[in-house]
Amino acid sequence: MSNQMNTMDIKEILKYLPHRYPFLLIDRVLDFTAGESLHAIKNVTINEPFFVGHFPVAPVMPGVLILEAMAQATGLLAFKTMSSEPSPDVLYYFAGIDNARFKRVVEPGDQLHFEVKMIKERRGIGVFYGEAKVDGELVCSAEIMCARREISK
């Protein structure tokens, strides 16, 4: 068994995810095992556009964007599991969420760690469990579904 870690820098992430600024919410993948799990990070800075209005006096990352970032990490794991290479003709859509729970706020200067695990896959639909943490402390957890779709041009 190899101890080699599978990582993805931002250049590789951009090949898999269609998201771009200001909606690309994953900065790096620290490790992944196709069909099993993925560990990604998002560095949260005061320069994030959502902090202008959420909230100017006490900036907090919106919970829906924490879930979106978790869904993007899930999409990367789905791509690495259910497809061989990135393709402009294939997308993984956020198809559902269950049991989302928030435990603490995320503020500028925090580094979000996303751990997503594959639960099952059938007919292009994947079910995953994800957690977001800051400094080892649970921020959010959820079950996420994503669906593989070919894009017709």
From Swiss-Prot:
One GO CC term, this protein: membrane
Top-level EC class as recorded in UniProt: lyase
UniProt cross-references to Pfam families, sorted A to Z: FabA
This enzyme's EC code(s): 4.2.1.59
Lineage: Bacteria, Pseudomonadati, Pseudomonadota, Gammaproteobacteria, Alteromonadales
Organism (species): Shewanella amazonensis (strain ATCC BAA-1098 / SB2B)
Major localization listed first in the record, in broad terms: cytoplasm
Subcellular location: Cytoplasm
Official protein name in the record: 3-hydroxyacyl-[acyl-carrier-protein] dehydratase FabZ
Active site, renumbered: H54
